[in-house]
Amino acid sequence: METNILALMATALFIIIPTAFLIILYAQTNK
């Protein structure tokens, strides 16, 4: 179970971090 939770967290971070980076970059570009 713990390994599944860690894998889920790793996948979530792998998706969330680039998405957040693109959103910030997009917001800065529109300023």
From Swiss-Prot:
GO terms for cellular component: chloroplast thylakoid membrane; photosystem II. It holds the Pfam family PsbM. InterPro entries: PSII_PsbM, PSII_PsbM_sf. It is a single-pass membrane protein. One of its GO terms (biological process) is photosynthesis, light reaction. The chain crosses the membrane at residues 5-25. It is found in: Plastid, Chloroplast thylakoid membrane. Keywords: Chloroplast, Membrane, Photosynthesis, Photosystem II, Plastid, Reaction center, Thylakoid, Transmembrane, Transmembrane helix. This is Photosystem II reaction center protein M. It comes from Mesostigma viride. The lineage of its organism: Eukaryota, Viridiplantae, Streptophyta, Mesostigmatophyceae, Mesostigmatales.
